[in-house]
Amino acid sequence: MPVDKEEAIKENLDSWDELASVHAQGSGAEFYRIEQWLAGESKLAPWEIEEVGPVVGKSLLHLQCHIGTDSLSWSREGAKVTGLDYSPSAIREAERFAGMIGVDDARFVVSRVRDAVESLEGEEFDIVYTGRGALCWLPDIEQWASVCSSLVKQGGMLYLEESTPMINALEPMAVEGGSVFGLRYDLFNTEAVSEVSEGSYADPDYPGSRRSHCWEYRYDSTVSYTHLTLPTI
């Protein structure tokens, strides 16, 4: 049954607000390799650094930055970073981390992606970056592309690091003699996928259950809306 998008976003926010400290300094910190990251390990994949190219002195906006470890990894590469996330708890953790590693020119803003242009007062950036596992928490991919088009400078770059939605669509299914992967849901579904789950992806044993809602976007939809909205970049 279709869910109300605003109610879905509120439930997601409640979950992310609760889990931010768990991921940053609680039982989920091992999953995030916080200790290693604080010691200098980058959260960026080698191909991200290679494909984005030199960022020294460039302005970089990280949408849906969560606790800021990816954002601050870009700071370590020399970018002037702005991180944006709708979870106040996550932004507090990001600001705490910036202080811990001595990055004083990064800023973090509490805002939904749809409100980013207003929240950032129309500022434009050399690079707009979105990391893996972020788009599925947005209810409108066309709106995302439109917002990005207003945030990227002429001649700038939108960089999206994302995995195929097929990964989330598959789950193991028991069959005689073992198990096989089957589809959890229809990849052509355009409604939210809602579920109640225990723990966190960073700590499956974390107590309590949370209801979450996500929207899966096929590559063709993402590429099409990005191309239509960002034709001159």
How would you label these PLM feature ranges?
Residues 30-58:
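Conserved alpha-helix/loop element of class I SAM-dependent methyltransferases that forms part
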Residues 118-127:
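A short acidic, Gly/Pro-enriched loop at the edge of an enzyme's catalytic core
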Residues 157-200:
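Conserved class I S-adenosyl-L-methionine
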